[in-house]
Amino acid sequence: MNWDSNNNNNKNSNNNNNNSSSSSYNINNNYSSFNNSNNNNINNNNINTNNNNNNNNNNNNNNNNNNNNNNNNNNNNNNKNNSSNNYHLAHINVYQQYPIKPLPISFNSFNTNMFQQQQQQQQQQQQLPQHLPPLGSSGSSNGGPNLMGYAQIPPNYFKPLSPPSFHPPTSPQSFFNNNTNNNNNNNNNNNNNINININNNNNSNNYINDSTNSNNLNTSNGAINTSSHLFINSPNHHSDNRSFIESRSPASMNASPIHFNDPTFKVPVHLPSLSITNSPSLNSSIDSSYRLNNNNNNNNNNGSNNSSFNSTPTKFEQLQLQLQQQQLQQQLQQQQQLQQQQQQLQQQQQLQQQQQQQLQQQQQQQLQQQQQQQQQQLQQQQQLQQQQQQQSTSHIHFSTAPTPIVSHHYNLQQPLQQYPQNIYSHTNILNQNNNSKPINTNSSSSNNNNNNNNNNNNNNNNNNNNNNCNYNNSNNSYNNNTTNTNNNPNNKRSQTKNQQQQQPQPQQQQLQQQQPQQSVINVNKKTTKVSKTKTSNQKLTVNNNNNNNNNNNNNNNNNNNNNNNNNNNNNNTIQQQQQQQSNDIKLLLKNSIYSSRNDLKELLSQPTEYTDSEYPEIVGKYRILEKIGQGTFSGVYKSVCIDGPNIGLIVALKRVAPTSSPARILNEIHSLLRVGGHYNVSALFGALRYKDQVTLILPFFEHDSFKDYFFQMSNENIKHYLYALFDSLRHIHQNNICHRDVKPTNFLYSIKNNSFLLIDFGLAQEMPNSNSNSNSNSNSNSNSNSNSNSNSNSNNNNNNNNNNTNNNFNGNNSNNDFNNFINMNNSNSNNNNNNNSNNNNNNNNNNNNNNNNNSNNNNNSNNSQEEIILPSTNENGTTTSNASSTSNTTSSSSSSSNKSKNLRNDPKPQPAPRAGTRGFRAPEVLLKYNKQTTAIDIWSVGVILLCMISGRYPFFISPDDMTSLAEIVSIIGTKKIVDIAHLLEKKISISHSIPPTPWRDLSRRLRSESSCDKQDVPVELYDLLERCLDPNPLTRITASEALLHPFLVVNNNSNNNNNNS
């Protein structure tokens, strides 16, 4: 390309695009004109080049281009004469490398040996960087960025060159037409142009603008300082493939003049990354791309001069761009994945927060419910206290329906303080200071002093096991009126602790040595909380009366003292002895009450008849105190816990006989776990097993014997008793469990504590959901009139010399649990004379009751026939045992021999369950009906009610099932029992017809003959009795319906009115 300086057709143009100064390279040539404009916001300077007069003007953006006058802001003259010898051409071969490294430099006509030596010396003095150092680092002579390497050039190396010549093509017009292009899209494809992209930035801190110009196809591949003029010399375009860069001394650089003769002179050689592509012919498509990214560090140029020319990218660049695009896409995908993961984490955190909030809300609700329940219990306790203080009648006082116990299961691994101390009782006990009159167990009060079973004379016959003493456990439970009404100076309470802790007198010590220390004292507990440690404020007070209560009435105390004058001396001695014992031993209070460790040690030091070899399962865990019940399949023992967190706890151990089936034991455990602990039903503390021996741990419950109070119960007493019993049965029937052994000895009652407990689920059976059990009412479920108070002690007002009768926990029949038919017309002396006969009858009637309940005799096959023959009965309803009756039975059986032959081909009937106690079995059980329901428990309740109304216990006495059925027929009549048998698909044969006897007439006649309470029985009670003793199990009343009966509802409403008042 020949740059002609004599041409006067220079074209200058300033194009402003997008608020930026845009200048075009105007090559003054007659044959060609190149106009390349860029629409991007890039400042392009005008370069005006003239062969004859090369004027290089570096001006600001607002300066005009002058060809003749060279005006620079920095007063730097860049005009050089082409004819002078100051032009030196350096032939530099630059090779593109990546990453950017110092490029090798080759010189023509140069002594390489000298140069190598100097280069080695220079490397020793200053190590050349392998890569371009960062911006602003040391090494630049002008203070700019170190973007250049240094090559030492010897003197006289540069030679003057003549101005390059340009040989135009033969046809100027064709060249002009081929080379005239106006490119506005930064793309110069198939043009005969040499495009140079130069990015001049005033920021001296920019190294290589790779990242900022990443979207531009003309990316930076190197850096070059373009402050000096660049001349492109291509002398022979048609034959020479080389490109030359002529470098002249830059005048714009504020540096000293260059002395080429100086051997130490170092020519700054810039190291750009150049990609030069030349074609052998100019007429062909020449595409030479010079991509230079230069950081202009020249302080003389006040404006930013950016000149860029675009060309088509090479294949290598295209591949690089594709790789960059792929990398960008991968980065975008990774970012999206990271964002998705972050979103998932956020969602999980939100879910966790929501779950935590829900848990917190549930916990708060549970706490609120517990607080509400506690508040309700406290309110009910306060109401009960107020009601008990208001009650003062001559009969047994019952409180209103108790609150159901919330706790269901009890674990012995946890301390017992977590459980309610009175599990089956109200926390409030009847007021001991009221004027209530207890039941007199003797028929005549005039014979109290002559009765061997008198409570005041038990000290002589029972080894001090039934002494009547009042022990107040709380510090503030002593009544001031007690010391005034009792004419005994020893009953006065000491005022100071010193008086309470005085040493006993010598007489008291002698009495203590003479009398044994194993005497059991009835303790009246005033409060529910008992301290484990000894308190000096505790003191025994003995009242000289039969009531065992601190009565405020002077008349009652005086009367009792007059009746018991013969026992005052004995009571005084007992009091002195117990005062000494109270300072040493704290009595073991019953029903979940602790004793101190000192008392427990002294208790364990006493000899016992129960050895560890006989009871290996309880060795080191429990200590047996006494036996309180014995049956065919189990025995019950009063025991104390001697190890673990529940040390000192009084419990009842039920040792099941090894001969019992495992299914029966498992059935009892499951039944207690399902329904125990609620509505006066016994709970299960735990179980022990040693080989074949299984022992159940049950709560100990102090109670009174049924035969001592049933004939003295008033109508109000009967209401509370029945309400508690029906409430317990409703609870177990709703859980489809039938007790099958409901009787007075299995429904324990404590008169003093006014509490009830249903026990002995050994014969319990799971029943399907029947109609008789389904119609339950929710209104009657919430309230129960039975009181679940289980206090530590009660008054042992029993007429038996045996101590085991007071603690009849098991419910199985023993020799002293039942008496024969009691004739209440006899006097007290007759009762004493008939004790032996009664005991003998008990032995005959109660020998192994459970044998008939759980084992089948040889007569069971005969009883399972469709035709049932009953023994003949008299008009009075009693069975005959003479020879005629037996002959009739045999004749009737012989007459039915033909029928029995026909029954041989019939399939054998299924065995019907007949478990239960004789005298309390329902007609469907006696008739061996297979589809039995929970109605059999209601029949047993009717029998208990009949004993209360008639004053006779037990009411039905029979050795077998047929006799029991004949006794029922003698009362309800022949027609009813035949109809029921036909309804149950049974056939019964009776010798003669018997008319029914109304229950009202029967009970009145028996009640008038007895010495029981002559209070009139209301009509509602007779109606309830008839509905309970309905022979049809389908129409018999249920437990839920019984709770809504008028006899019990009136009582409940009256109690509510009292509470409201």
Curated annotation (Swiss-Prot):
Residues 116-147, 177-194, 287-311, 431-491, 499-525, 533-581, 769-864, 872-900 have a biased composition (Low complexity). ATP binds at I628, G629, Q630, G631, T632, F633, S634, G635, V636, K654. It is an enzyme of class 2 (transferase). The active site is at D741. GO terms for biological process: intracellular signal transduction. It catalyses: L-seryl-[protein] + ATP = O-phospho-L-seryl-[protein] + ADP + H(+); L-threonyl-[protein] + ATP = O-phospho-L-threonyl-[protein] + ADP + H(+). Residues 315-393, 558-588 form a coiled coil. The keyword Metal-binding applies. Its cofactor is Mg(2+). Residues 622-1048 form the Protein kinase domain. One of its GO terms (molecular function) is ATP binding. Residues 1-86, 115-194, 287-313, 428-582, 769-919 are annotated as: Disordered. Its EC number is 2.7.11.1. Residues 161-171 have a biased composition (Pro residues). GO terms for cellular component: cytoplasm; nucleus. Keywords: ATP-binding, Coiled coil, Kinase, Magnesium, Metal-binding, Nucleotide-binding, Serine/threonine-protein kinase, Transferase. Disulfide bonds: none annotated. SUPFAM superfamilies: Protein kinase-like (PK-like). Belongs to the protein kinase superfamily. Ser/Thr protein kinase family. CDC7 subfamily. This is Probable serine/threonine-protein kinase cdc7.
